[in-house]
Curated annotation (Swiss-Prot):
This is UPF0102 protein HPSH_02690. NCBIfam families: PRK12497.2-4. Belongs to the UPF0102 family. InterPro entries: Restrct_endonuc-II-like (IPR011335), tRNA_endonuc-like_dom_sf (IPR011856), UPF0102_YraN-like (IPR003509). It comes from the Bacteria. One of its GO terms (molecular function) is nucleic acid binding. Transmembrane segments: none annotated. It comes from Helicobacter pylori (strain Shi470). Pfam families: UPF0102. The lineage of its organism: Bacteria, Pseudomonadati, Campylobacterota, Epsilonproteobacteria, Campylobacterales.
Amino acid sequence: MRFLNNKHRAKGLKAEEEACEFLKTLGFEMVERNFFSKFGEIDIIALKKGVLHFIEVKSGENFDPIYAITPSKLKKMIKTIRCYFSQKDPNSDFCIDALIVKNGKFELLENITF
């Protein structure tokens, strides 16, 4: 696991906080934030219309943050989701989403795959 410096981590936390507020305006209910497993972390777990959304938040100003979500990152997310379901209701419908924050604008990409 890569350790982030305090400035980088603070920017990430701010982006996640803003992302939660944005998601609430779209009708999402926050279930959990920063769920950790030995495989990785899920930034936001939210519920909308009975579907759990596992959301990776990526932010950036000088590059397109979507490129930070690689096939390797998605595989780690899937393993982490399996860990989540081993502790919670394994019968929930779910999808993996990305929330891109760039220059103060938000873009939700639902049901991403590789």
